[in-house]
């Protein structure tokens, strides 16, 4: 289980992201440095589709392709959501796969809820290129109660005590499963 926004106390996190869009540059730098030091192992990066609205994300992809950084695997949670609502309403990113490919990355798109598909995508040979796995997910999966909040799912306060109780009841029911 990962924190909503990982930080230095999260298991396996060597760094936290800081401002939106910076993690990809940090991960590229760590992967490049590890390769230069001849260290084995991979750098994994988890980010959201909304981060592709930041120019720094595209610059990092271009740099990774140029420097042939292939010890980096990037998983993008493509759930179409961000703090301000639907990503397509804030700034449409499609066709995301083609755009990322055009920057020199090896890109695979899978059902982000399918662990076998994810595992197969992670095994893709991507010599001299970073691997980007677009994991299409539903932000409601397993928590259909959130659907009525759509498209605003981040940092939303309860409207009233009834809604608060409804969520408490839902969470208590989840503990029984």
Per-region residue spans from a language model:
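Short acidic, glycine/serine/threonine-rich loops at helix termini
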Residues: 56-58, 84-88, 143-148
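Conserved thiamine diphosphate
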Residues: 38-40, 88-121, 175
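A short, conserved beta-to-alpha structural element at the edge of catalytic cores
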Residues: 67-92, 96, 103
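Acidic, glycine-rich active-site loops and adjacent beta-strand->loop/helix elements
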Residues: 47-54, 78-82, 114-115, 139
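Generic beta-sheet signal
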Residues: 41-45, 72, 127-135
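Cofactor-binding active-site loop characterized by glycine-rich and histidine/acidic residues
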Residues: 1-66
